[in-house]
Amino acid sequence: GLVNGLLSSVLGGGQGGGGLLGGIL
């Protein structure tokens, strides 16, 4: 997700691969 991806960018992981890429995708 966008929100989860952006927040996860700080943590270094998240939905869709994590990080900024995860936020965009």
UniProtKB/Swiss-Prot annotation:
Residues annotated as transmembrane: none
Tissue expr: Expressed by the skin glands.
Main location: secreted
Keyword check for Secreted: yes
Any one of the GO CC terms: other organism cell membrane
Subcellular location: Secreted; Target cell membrane
Alphabetic keyword roster: Amphibian defense peptide, Immunity, Innate immunity, Membrane, Secreted, Target cell membrane, Target membrane
BP-aspect Gene Ontology terms: innate immune response
Task performed by this protein: May play an immunomodulatory role in frog skin in response to microbial pathogens, since it increases the production of the pro-inflammatory cytokines TNF-alpha, IL-1 beta, IL-12, and IL-23 by mouse peritoneal macrophages and has no effect on the production of the anti-inflammatory cytokine IL-10. It is not known whether stimulation of cytokine production arises from a non-specific interaction of the peptide with the macrophage membrane or from interaction with a specific receptor.
Domain notes: Amphipathic peptide that adopts a random coil conformation in water, a beta-sheet structure in methanol, and an alpha-helical conformation in trifluoroethanol-water. Plasticins have huge conformational plasticity. They can display random coil, alpha-helical, beta-sheet or beta-harpin structures.
Family statement drawn from the similarity comment of this UniProt entry: Belongs to the frog skin active peptide (FSAP) family. Plasticin subfamily.
Protein's UniProt name: Plasticin-L1
Taxonomic source organism: Leptodactylus laticeps
